[in-house]
Amino acid sequence: MAGHSKWANIKFRKGVQDAKRGKIFTKLIREITVAARMGGGDESSNPRLRDAVKKALNANMKRDTIDNAVKRGVGGADGEAMIAMRYEGYGPGGVAILVDCLSDNKNRTVSEVRHAFSKHGGNLGTDGSVSYLFTNQGEILMASNQPEDKVMEIAIDAGASDVAVEDSQIEIITPVEAYHTVLNALQDAGLEVEQSHLTMRAQTLVPISDETAESLIKLIDMLEDLDDVQEVYSNAEFSEKILESMN
């Protein structure tokens, strides 16, 4: 469990750094626009849009910018049509990697993703080559100073599949269909949620050496820096040394 939540923290810290460069804003606006185009502009009835807006607010995006992205999505006339794509491959050490993209040019995107894999000792696979190693689930992270018994009772009653305390966090895992029910139940009870998102969660983590980890992180960084890439998932288990170096 710890490997999942700690990597989520690494991604969160990197996200904050990206936000300072303005790079993450482009990806968030794109996700908001596509979510609104696909499911409408009402956050209460569009879970994908609700999650995208929450990510944008957490990255300190102005509400006006978010609203404009929603309007563009609902209007549907501005810009090129974005297509959701998922690429699968292997990184250094045979680590399984999923890459979720939104793009208006599939050829450009696959070329850039393939180049990143090749440059850092990985290779792009075929559809289904590694996706079976991951499960689509909800993940909710809370500070461990919250009342653990209360958190566990509310989360399980609302449909969570697992609750665990790791280091300074409480990690709650939910089926996709129960994600918003659990999240709302916790918030309605006055409990503070630090992070929450839908994710592709590795069923089993693969321990890797520190040397392999350095190469893998370079690959993941390069993938995440691509404009068309929205999310990168792996089944790597990092050592404490590597995790601490990411702080």
From Swiss-Prot:
GO terms for biological process: regulation of DNA-templated transcription. Keywords: Cytoplasm, DNA-binding, Transcription, Transcription regulation. It comes from the Bacteria. It comes from Legionella pneumophila (strain Paris). Pfam families: TACO1_YebC_N, Transcrip_reg. It is found in: Cytoplasm. This is Probable transcriptional regulatory protein lpp1249. Belongs to the TACO1 family. GO terms for cellular component: cytosol. One of its GO terms (molecular function) is DNA binding.
